[in-house]
């Protein structure tokens, strides 16, 4: 009897105790994406890398949907292609992976195959494989 009462209490109280992400209004989401896009386009290395990481975190924590953040895809593609450091390019690759846009995923494949930087290439290859494993889709190429 005690166990039944405990189980019922747990089933009733867990949904109230578990953390829930609050849904941001559309205006705030748009402002957040616009500010992060400006940061990604910045000439400051730390701001570019930090903006890409924050974008990934916000999508990962469900504060932003990948559709909301699609405006930042082109600057992220540019950052992945022309980044000055490995960390900057990796931050862009991870953010593109989290966006899940087919153009970004295809670009990860291109960097994985053709990039001379072994570290960036290996991470892009792993992100490319992970995306297809998580979504149950086919790879376009074996590395």
Go through the PLM ranges and name each one.
Residues 4-13:
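Sec-dependent N-terminal signal peptides
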Residues 26-38, 62-80, 101-113, 134-143:
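Amphipathic alpha-helical scaffolding segments comprising HEAT/armadillo-like alpha-solenoid repeats
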Residues 43-44, 84-85, 116-117:
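Short inter-helical turns and helix N-cap capping residues of alpha-solenoid HEAT/ARM repeat scaffolds
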Residues 48-59:
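HEAT-repeat alpha-solenoid elements in large eukaryotic scaffold proteins
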Residues 51, 92, 123-124:
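Conserved hydrophobic register position within alpha-solenoid helical repeats
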Residues 56-57, 97, 129:
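Structural signature of alpha-helical solenoid repeat scaffolds
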């Amino acid at each position: 009897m005690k166990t039944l009462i405990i189980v019922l209490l747990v089933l009733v109280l867990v949904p109230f105790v578990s953390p829930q992400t609050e849904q941001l209004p559309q205006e705030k989401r748009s402002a957040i994406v616009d500010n992060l896009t400006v940061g990604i386009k910045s000439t400051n290395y730390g701001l570019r890398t930090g903006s890409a990481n924050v974008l990934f975190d916000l999508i990962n924590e469900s504060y932003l949907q990948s559709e909301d953040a699609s405006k930042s895809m082109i600057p992220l593609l540019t950052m992945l292609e022309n980044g000055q450091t490995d960390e900057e390019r990796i931050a862009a690759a991870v953010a593109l992976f989290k966006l899940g846009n087919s153009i970004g995923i295809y670009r990860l494949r291109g960097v994985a195959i053709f990039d001379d930087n072994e570290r960036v290439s290996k991470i892009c290859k792993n992100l490319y494989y992970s995306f297809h494993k998580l979504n149950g889709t086919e790879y376009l190429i074996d590395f």
